[in-house]
Amino acid sequence: MATINLATKFQEKVDEKFVAESKSALVTNREYDFVGAHTIKVYSVGTAEMNDYGRNTDGTSRYGTVKDLDATAQEISMEKDRSFTFAIDKADEDETLGALNAGKALARQLREVVIPEVDTYAYKKMADNAGTKVTETITNETAYTAMVTANETLDENEVPYEGRVAICTPAYVSLLKQDKNAVLDSDIGQDLKLRGVIANMDGASIQKVPSKLLPTGQNFILAHPVATTLAVKLEEYKIHTEPQGVSGALVEGRIYYTAFVRTNKAKAIYSSKKQASV
């Protein structure tokens, strides 16, 4: 049985496509990898207090009392090991004039199934582990204020100003556009538009995503990519050209991934959900 390993042949294009079309890639980082490991430990190291220097005092240390820095470990494991398979019948490929072939089928599978699944998973991790969680009823008169409050919270938490992204549902974006106080700058690059960014507002990119990608009841998530890591350990795609029992090609794919919010960076995520109806 002949096999074409698409992960080898098309890996660069597949990876580029994933980054270009993945909406969550805009708000996550790839700072950690799990090569050779199922679990890694991420350490958060504390800081020391400032003291008044004891210039004319007795003692072994004029710099203050020596204390060990706090160091906490966050243990992260790979969580999602997902796969897919489908057949491409020879007659179907011929009668569709080549429209049904491995390359196009893989692109469609990534675009319509794999990438949305990974995005949904990453967004849920962000919402569940946000440093600030609020529930609120947003109207076309309060939509802008809600985002201002979110940005102010990140400011107070000393989150970098550059690179913030507001992940918004279409319903929230609609309310924001109706709010007379909101000024949306739609002068953005094509690469950002492909990831759902529709405008910039107060320094943050406004990214509109289908509500099905976000947790139920979500208004928006304001975040900086420093907080959330998306690690894809394995992407494997194969075509078996002469499989037993199939007149045509058998396509198989696997993606092994995880996402996590670093404990000491959780304050870089602000989650706004709808107020539960009574």
Enumerate the predicted regions with their spans.
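Extended, solvent-exposed, turn-rich assembly/linker loops in the middle of proteins
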Residues: 128-198
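Structured, hydrophobic secondary-structure cores that serve as assembly/anchoring elements
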Residues: 41, 47, 73, 79-98, ...
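Flexible, active-site-adjacent loop/turn segments at secondary-structure boundaries
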Residues: 40, 67, 74-76, 84-86, ...
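Alpha-helical scaffold segments that mediate packing/assembly in large oligomeric complexes
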Residues: 91-157, 270-278
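Generic alpha-helix structural propensity
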Residues: 37, 61, 81-83, 101, ...
